[in-house]
């Protein structure tokens, strides 16, 4: 529901790495507010040419709920789980289409070796695509490259950091499972499936075949919302179990807050450059529900890229 922010993000990406992108996949979560019409507008497609813009609308609004895809039952869904919750895989009130899961439409349809995944609130200032591609070229076992984190949700944040993880440090024998702040340090988080560690998918790149392999072997999707984990966190743990590598080419000392400034990353991109996470437009993430400044972004598109946003479609 923020087409202006998404298009501005894509314009900044095109400016710094346009020749490295072939196609863009946009999954609209049933916005029903004119966003799809904007993405398909002739002026938008002409601006981004020769990129191919692939736009899809979900079969139903998923928001941050879990999609139960028949045939894909992850390990915590044991017989005890299925005794009382088996109906979730057939209930028509529950989403079941795998392409309604974040990023899965692109992962299932791209013919490229690597897929760049981004949020709609990122401002690119330097070519991070080449940085990630070099990381994959240097390590054939690499499955994902990007911004490591979610430290603000982990009780190990005081003794751990992305930089330490990338140097080989592990905060417990249970890693990448992580106890929450209310649990004792020696708690086996496998009992609760708590997961903080991940590669933050607001800007990351995956090896498509390795990503698909983890999905098939572990029956979990990269972008699904599994028990006690945010997007990509459950998949990240299963990727580690599969023996694949990960990398943050720009690891920070610490990430005590979701919006902590990270000079290492900001040389290449600025996440939440509008001053708030994108989801805060709809939900209170600790700072109240914030106002989406559509006009500011429209003005930036005109000032920085000379693009006249299709005003007739706003509203």
Task: Report residues per predicted region.
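Active-site-proximal specificity loops/subdomain of glycosyltransferases
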Residues: 41-109
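Short beta-strand/loop segment that forms part of the nucleotide-sugar
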Residues: 21-31, 56-60
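Conserved catalytic core of nucleotide-sugar-dependent glycosyltransferases
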Residues: 125-222
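Short, acidic, metal-binding catalytic loop of nucleotide-sugar glycosyltransferases
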Residues: 11-21
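Active-site beta-to-alpha loop of glycosyltransferases that engages the nucleotide-sugar donor
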Residues: 1-8, 30
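The conserved acidic donor/metal-binding loop of glycosyltransferases
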Residues: 119-123
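Short aromatic/hydrophobic "clamp" motif used to bind/position activated sugar donors
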Residues: 115
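C-terminal catalytic/acceptor-binding lobe
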Residues: 220-315
């Amino acid at each position: 529901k923020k087409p202006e922010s998404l298009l501005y993000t894509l314009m900044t990406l095109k400016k710094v790495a346009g020749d490295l992108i072939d196609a863009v996949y946009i999954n609209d979560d049933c916005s029903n507010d004119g966003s799809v019409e904007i993405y398909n507008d002739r002026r938008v497609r002409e601006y981004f040419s020769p990129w191919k813009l692939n736009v899809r609308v979900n079969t139903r609004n998923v928001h941050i709920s879990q999609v139960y895809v028949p045939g894909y039952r992850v390990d915590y869904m044991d017989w005890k789980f299925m005794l009382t919750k088996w109906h979730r895989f057939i209930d028509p009130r529950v989403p079941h289409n795998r392409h309604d899961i974040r990023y899965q439409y692109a992962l299932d349809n791209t013919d490229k070796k690597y897929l760049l995944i981004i949020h709609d609130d990122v401002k690119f200032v330097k070519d991070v695509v080449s940085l990630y591609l070099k990381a994959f070229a240097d390590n054939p076992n690499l499955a994902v490259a990007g911004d490591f984190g979610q430290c603000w949700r982990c009780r190990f944040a005081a003794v751990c950091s992305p930089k330490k993880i990338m140097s080989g440090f592990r905060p417990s024998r249970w890693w990448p499972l992580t106890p929450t702040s209310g649990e004792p340090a020696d708690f086996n988080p496998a009992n609760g499936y708590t997961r903080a560690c991940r590669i933050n998918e607001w800007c990351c790149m995956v090896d498509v075949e390795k990503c698909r392999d983890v999905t098939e072997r572990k029956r979990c999707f990269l972008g699904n919302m599994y028990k006690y984990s945010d997007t990509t966190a459950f998949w990240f743990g299963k990727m580690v179990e599969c023996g694949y590598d990960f990398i943050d080419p720009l690891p920070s000392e610490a990430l005590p807050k979701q919006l902590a400034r990270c000079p290492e990353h900001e040389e290449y991109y600025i996440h939440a450059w509008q001053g708030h996470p994108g989801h805060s437009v709809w939900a209170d993430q600790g700072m109240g529900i914030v106002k989406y400044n559509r006009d500011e972004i429209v003005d930036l598109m005109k000032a920085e890229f000379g693009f006249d946003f299709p005003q007739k479609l706003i509203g």
